[in-house]
Amino acid sequence: MNLLFSAALTISKACQAQNQLFYLCPASMEKTLEQFRLVAGRCRDLFLKKTADYGTAWRILRPASITDQLYIKALRIRSIEEKGVQKVADSVESEFIGLVNYSVLALIQLELPEDAPLDLDTGRVAELFDQHLEENLRLLQSKNHDYGEAWRLMRVSSMTDLILQKLLRIKQIEDNAGQTLVSEGLEANFRDIINYAVFALIRLGESNTE
């Protein structure tokens, strides 16, 4: 028993030295909520500025078109990760912000009735955006309760892969007319994409300041 305890203590100290047990600390979860809100604020600011420039032209997009836009963005991120260089100016960070915002667009489109007007005023758009990000924050808190800060042990490239996996699931669900037998539906997958993209932005922000 003493040997087991000693081994566990040794592993614990080794992990702490590599900052690998950070996710177990309650203070870390508070930090995550703060970081989530900061990243969400950046996404919201861009979202509303584009709404001011273009209105709600995105309302014309059918669900599959939004999914394809998300897929293209995620594929570009993976391509840059694998090649290590990029030739187009748009940064990886901007693509992750795009993943957040397009996923919110998808959730808004799923929520609005078919007879909703194409043109929505900025105030209404801001209200809908805030509602969905708050729901994602609640989802994050619930998952952090169960999993701790395990996402902090993930590589950003793994988050990219999980986003692509979610998008492939969404494409299949859409091809099945939105029906699933035992799996999560469209909303749950879009919400997971938002949170993984936010996590990636947090990790990238931290690496840029180290």
Regions found by a protein language model. Give the residues of each.
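Intrinsically disordered, low-complexity sequence elements enriched in Ser/Thr/Gly/Pro
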Residues: K13-A14, R42
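Intrinsically disordered, low-complexity regulatory regions
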Residues: Y23-E210
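Short hydrophobic targeting helices and cationic amphipathic motifs
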Residues: L3-S6, Q16, Q20, L24
